């Protein structure tokens, strides 16, 4: 069922919408999916989108909300007019779920749209609690999101429309966003994946490029042909299912 929770963190009341599978607690811990809304959004939208998978996949689905009214995830320090420790907030929730014997510590995942997808790249770089992440319809910030010596290799699946403004990358005085191809290259190299991807189709309009390392680490680009920042609903549903398949096949050791 669904629950709404407000958590005090960093002097702010932070809103979570949590959907748990009917079998919660009967079979020990469960995989957890965090989902992050786009700029100006609320937790309700991603909750409606992802919560149906709670029972289907035995997942705890957590739709987190950025501090209102700005409602933008802190994907890079110094970018927004006001800043909040969103990374620390998410890590606190993960810690509580694991210590409460609800979350499987080897199966914590994240996805997000637009601003939420950018935030996923920050989590991929700065944290080591996620088994895999799937940023969607977003860019990746040059410098801020490049993995470094402190980053743990992690599987990533990027879903993006080839007509999305972020697909080809962008640059302005405040921020440079990598193209989809360039960010795949950055994470492919870091995860020690082969240079040549396996290319498969999910119907005519979804093209999947999978880069794999000898140890089985993946970096994947799911390109939605002819689609912009918001995928057509049937394609979005198909991409979401593909993303969940990808996420759940990975475990953090």
What does each of the following model-derived ranges do?
Residues 1-32, 56, 78, 82, ...:
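A domain-start/cap signature at the N-terminus of enzymes
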Residues 24-71, 142-143, 166-168, 230:
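Short substrate-entry loop that stabilizes the transition state in hydrolases
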Residues 65-85:
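Cap/lid segment of the alpha/beta-hydrolase catalytic domain
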Residues 79-101:
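Alpha/beta-hydrolase active-site loop
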Residues 151-156, 215-219:
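Short, proline-enriched alpha-helix->beta-strand connector loops that line the catalytic pocket
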Residues 158-160:
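Short beta-strand/loop motif that positions the catalytic acidic residue
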Residues 165-179, 232:
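Conserved alpha/beta-hydrolase "acid-adjacent" motif
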Residues 228-235:
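Catalytic histidine-centered segment of alpha/beta-hydrolase-like enzymes
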């Amino acid at each position: 069922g669904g629950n709404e929770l407000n958590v005090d963190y960093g002097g702010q009341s932070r809103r979570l919408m949590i959907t748990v599978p009917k079998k919660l607690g009967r079979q020990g811990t469960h995989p957890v999916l965090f989902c992050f809304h786009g700029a100006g959004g609320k937790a309700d939208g991603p909750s409606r989108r992802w919560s149906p998978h709670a029972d289907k996949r035995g997942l705890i689905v957590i739709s987190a909300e950025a501090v209102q009214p700005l409602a933008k995830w802190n994907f890079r320090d110094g970018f927004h007019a006001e800043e909040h420790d969103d990374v620390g907030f998410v890590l606190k929730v993960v810690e509580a779920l694991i210590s409460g014997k609800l979350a499987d510590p080897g199966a914590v995942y994240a996805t997000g749209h637009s601003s939420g997808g950018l935030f996923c790249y920050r989590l991929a770089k700065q944290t080591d609690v996620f088994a895999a992440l799937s940023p969607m319809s977003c860019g990746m910030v040059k410098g801020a999101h490049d993995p470094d010596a402190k980053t743990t290799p992690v599987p990533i699946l990027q879903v993006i429309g080839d007509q999305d403004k972020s697909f080809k990358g962008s640059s302005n005085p405040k921020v440079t966003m990598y193209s989809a191809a360039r960010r795949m290259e950055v994470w492919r190299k870091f995860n020690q994946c082969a240079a040549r991807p396996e290319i498969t189709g999910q119907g005519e309009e979804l093209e999947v490029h999978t880069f794999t390392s000898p140890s089985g680490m993946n970096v994947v680009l799911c390109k939605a042909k002819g689609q912009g920042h918001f995928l057509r609903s049937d394609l979005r549903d198909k991409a979401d299912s593909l993303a969940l398949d990808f996420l759940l096949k990975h475990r953090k050791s």
